């Protein structure tokens, strides 16, 4: 079966720090995705499962309210019944299940758009560069690692290429560099430390290892580092970063 867009998933690394002090990077975390949609407006969140058996899990949420303050909440699943959050979220930063679902878990805004679906066997989703802040007197550069994985059970993606979406969100402040090797567990001491063994950081399209001409076989994955550049005393912004994956398959 040919590779489809739903087979190509962006996953987190094992260490996605909540500050500038903890380890960043590491091996792939195939339970946490880094793709989801922001609420179209601030709203309470609704969660439910496609399976009535999902009644023991909790979903731990971190996000921001309309004032920009970080808020947290733990929501208990009730099978296929809608459960509504107490808090109103302007955006979600992290959503993580206490245990994987028997069914797919949907996270939506109350009266607004669907935010994400957590597939069976996975734990949640997150936004890289959690609570990143600028320095009052100097610029700052942060590095966090994510992966692109081909979840197709049998087919290969040839000419696998990462393509940032220009002129949207934080495209002017984030570049990326592909690791010199697949499935690398490389980490750095904190997210202010630059990784080694990475192609030059840039904002253009780039193929996966080796030398930008590689392939992603079934269940294969490639790590790449995001580099975010912040100016001194830069104002807070509610934004996003988009990157696409392309290739050919048969």
What are these regions (language model features)?
Residues 5-30, 123-151, 155, 162:
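Beta-sheet-dominated interaction scaffolds and their linkers
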Residues 14-64:
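Autoprocessing Asn-cyclization modules and mimics
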Residues 25-26, 138-145, 220-224, 235-242:
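Short, solvent-exposed loop/turn segments enriched in Ser/Thr/Gly
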Residues 42-46, 86-102, 221-226:
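Noncatalytic modules at the cell exterior or secretory-pathway interfaces
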Residues 131-134, 198, 210-216:
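Beta-strand-rich interaction surfaces with strong enrichment in secreted/lumenal proteins
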Residues 136-195:
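Surface-exposed interaction patch
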Residues 182-184, 203-234:
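Intrinsically disordered, low-complexity Pro/Gly/Ser/Thr-rich segments with frequent PxxP/GP/PP motifs
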Residues 228-250:
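Serine/threonine-enriched low-complexity regions used as flexible
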């Amino acid at each position: 079966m040919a590779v489809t867009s739903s087979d190509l998933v962006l996953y987190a690394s094992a260490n996605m720090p909540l500050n500038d002090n903890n380890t960043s990077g590491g091996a792939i975390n195939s339970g946490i995705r880094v793709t989801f949609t922001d609420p179209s407006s601030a709203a309470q969140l609704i969660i439910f499962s496609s399976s009535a058996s999902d009644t023991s899990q909790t979903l731990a949420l971190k996000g921001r309210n309309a004032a920009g303050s970080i808020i947290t909440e733990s929501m208990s699943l009730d099978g296929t019944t809608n459960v509504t959050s107490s808090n109103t979220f302007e955006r979600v930063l992290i959503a993580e299940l206490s245990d994987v679902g028997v069914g797919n878990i949907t996270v939506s805004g109350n009266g607004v758009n669907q935010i994400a679906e957590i597939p069976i066997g996975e734990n949640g989703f997150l936004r890289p560069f959690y609570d990143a802040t600028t320095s009052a007197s100097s610029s700052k550069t942060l590095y966090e690692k994510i992966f692109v994985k081909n979840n197709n059970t049998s087919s290969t993606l040839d000419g696998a290429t990462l393509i940032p979406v220009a002129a949207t969100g934080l495209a002017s402040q984030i570049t990326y560099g592909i690791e010199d090797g697949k499935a690398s567990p490389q980490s750095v001491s904190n997210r202010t430390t630059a990784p080694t063994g990475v192609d030059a950081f840039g904002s253009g399209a780039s193929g996966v290892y080796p030398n930008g001409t590689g392939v992603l076989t079934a269940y294969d994955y490639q790590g790449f580092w995001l580099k975010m550049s912040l100016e001194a005393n830069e104002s807070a912004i509610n934004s996003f970063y988009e990157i696409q994956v392309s290739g050919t398959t048969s």
